[in-house]
């Protein structure tokens, strides 16, 4: 019997399909995982015991870097965040919530502005102006679908797992279908309809894309930030965090403290006021353990 390492690409009814060196092997999990109350997840890096008789067993789950989403995906390297310009309308507040959540999960984000082609010129110009700030603080921003599709294969590095996120109706499913169809054409695989209904619950799977994977999942249409500690929130606003090293007080929370570098840079226009407003709003929600307004609708 041989052992090999691979990545779980799908899981259904107690079986786990594991990609090992570009081949997919079907496995069963050993009972030891159940005893440990440990459940293998799509995205897990695992050790498989290979049997010439076709009885392959998953025997070890390697340490996870993270676990996000419902259904959960393990070891997500980056998130492609789909934010619409219209239908639904562009929201800086929602954008900041997503960025905060994924910063907390230690996952990088690439921003894609969808529906730019059906957005009135002046409105689109104003949105692009706002997104310029996010590029300045280190986020990659795409406003053109064709440009995104051209660059994505080189952005997804070997064995990385990417997933999509964004508000409902932003166009995640459309983009995901397109990317999966392209990947299937490249590999010669047969694509089946994804059958995404408004309330459809599906199994997560990974499909090969470039030298990594993209998770075929409904993504994250609603997030909550209640588990973040209030005094750690600034760590997930990278622009505020960078400025805070010059604050007079080491644990400055940028509220009423004297000598606050963050508030100084906001007044000078070097930090976007909208970012600070998002910080204060999320901070208040966490403090009060209160549901955000957009989740009440």
UniProtKB/Swiss-Prot annotation:
EC number of the protein: 3.6.1.-
Main location: cytoplasm
List of residues binding Zn(2+): 247, 252, 254, 260
Residue ranges of domain CP-type G in the record: 65-223
Pfam family, one: RsgA_GTPase
A GO BP annotation: ribosomal small subunit biogenesis
HAMAP family per UniProt: GTPase_RsgA
Name of the protein: Small ribosomal subunit biogenesis GTPase RsgA
UniProt organism field: Lactobacillus gasseri (strain ATCC 33323 / DSM 20243 / BCRC 14619 / CIP 102991 / JCM 1131 / KCTC 3163 / NCIMB 11718 / NCTC 13722 / AM63)
Gene: rsgA
């Amino acid at each position: 019997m041989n052992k090999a390492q691979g990545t779980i690409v799908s899981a259904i009814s107690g079986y786990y399909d594991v990609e090992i060196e570009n081949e997919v092997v079907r496995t069963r999990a050993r009972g030891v995982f159940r005893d440990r109350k440990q459940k293998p997840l799509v995205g897990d890096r695992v050790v498989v015991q290979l049997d010439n008789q076709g009885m392959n067993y998953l025997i070890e789950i390697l340490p996870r870097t993270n676990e996000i989403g419902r259904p959960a995906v393990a070891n997500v390297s980056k998130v492609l965040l789909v934010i619409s310009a219209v239908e639904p309308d562009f929201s800086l507040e929602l954008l900041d919530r997503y960025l905060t959540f994924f910063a907390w999960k230690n996952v990088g984000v690439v921003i894609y502005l969808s529906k730019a082609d059906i957005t009135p010129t002046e409105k689109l110009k104003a949105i692009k102006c706002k997104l310029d700030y996010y590029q300045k603080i280190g986020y990659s921003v795409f406003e053109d679908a064709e440009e995104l599709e051209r660059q994505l294969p080189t952005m997804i590095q070997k064995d990385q797992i990417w997933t999509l996120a964004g508000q409902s109706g932003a166009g995640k499913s459309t983009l995901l279908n397109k990317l999966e169809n392209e990947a299937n054409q490249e590999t010669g695989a047969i694509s089946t309809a994804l059958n995404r209904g408004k309330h459809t619950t599906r199994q997560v799977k990974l499909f090969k894309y470039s030298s990594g994977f993209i998770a075929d999942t409904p993504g994250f249409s609603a997030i909550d930030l209640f588990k973040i500690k209030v005094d750690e929130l600034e760590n997930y606003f990278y622009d505020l965090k960078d400025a805070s090293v010059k604050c007079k007080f080491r644990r400055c929370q940028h509220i009423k403290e004297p000598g606050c570098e963050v508030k100084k840079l906001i007044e000078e226009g070097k930090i976007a006021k909208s970012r600070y407003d998002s910080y204060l709003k999320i901070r208040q929600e966490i403090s009060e353990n209160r549901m955000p307004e957009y989740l009440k609708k």
